[in-house]
Amino acid sequence: MFVLRCNLTAVGKGRPRFTRSGLAYTPKKTADFEKKVKSLAKEKMQSEERQVYAKSIPLKMTVFFYFAPPKSWSKKKRQSCIEEHLPKTTKCDLSNLIKCVEDAFNGVVYEDDSSVAELNLGKYYAEKDAFTVFVERLDMVDDFDESERSEQEEE
């Protein structure tokens, strides 16, 4: 299992921008975040002497994003939501957050993010902004036996 803990503020994948001539480009904030995460992941992969997961290997990815509560909240409310690990329901969307991390891991942790077959995500309040990523092989388990399979074929 590959585990990466980052004390960074997670950034959601920004929509592509277009130049006047019509060329698409990734917003700077998104590109900088992806570059930083890619660099940290590459460093960790090398230090652990890990191989990149092949595209043919199904993977399970679990990511927990942590955000500090707004400074505008009262001290009591901030402390309460941190202690209770309350889910964060405001921007940025989980789907945009995970896309940024998946893209940063392309070619570093796995060959392509299409090999991620299962996702487990969470977005919570914590004392400091951070995120933790777990990537592991997905064990394929056949949930039903041969008798159930033959019954399904008969129907």
Segments from the language model and where they lie:
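Acidic, proline/glycine-enriched N-terminal capping motif
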Residues: 1-155
